[in-house]
Amino acid sequence: AGRMAEPKFSRKKLVLRSSAGGSQLGTEYAAAHSNHVSPETVLALGADAVLMMAVLGGADYRSLQAVGEDIDAFHQLSIPVIVEILSADFSKTNSFDVQYHGARIAAEMGADVVKAFYVDGFDKVTSCCPVPVILAGGPKDRDILDVARQALAEGARGFAFGRNIFQAKDPAATVAGLASLLG
């Protein structure tokens, strides 16, 4: 376990990614991602929430069993959980079926927030989900501000972006644009 080293970070919000399984660079993309962070470590680091992945379309029983057990463990220590929806066949992650069913399943398993990729019919994804849905970054071939604006119009409650910001031509302007969309 560790702690935040810099006092200037003490008032920032920290969401700690708690699961991993594989990457698109490897020879195998895991059908189930395993949790690698304990609730006690999350608290020791001062994190405000965790983000884990739910992988559908592969070893669903094993994947969802682990997600459910992990959500329960974090909730026992009052740690909010964000669940990101992925497909075992990564090329299908941005499909309506994966995002729609994944959002509903994650909420039913106890997720406090669902991180979903924008798909045609995104309003159905947000309306089927009884917890807030935040937008995942997704493909870099579209203007992220346009996608974010559309997602908000269709029920998204916020964003969880990484590469869409730090690989942007002007990351500060991208963050400012996203913040302006949220009011």
Regions found by a protein language model. Name each.
Residues A1-Q24, E28-L135, K140-F161, A172-V175, ...:
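Alpha/beta enzyme core
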Residues R163-K169:
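A short, acidic, flexible beta-alpha connecting loop/helix-capping segment that sits on the rim
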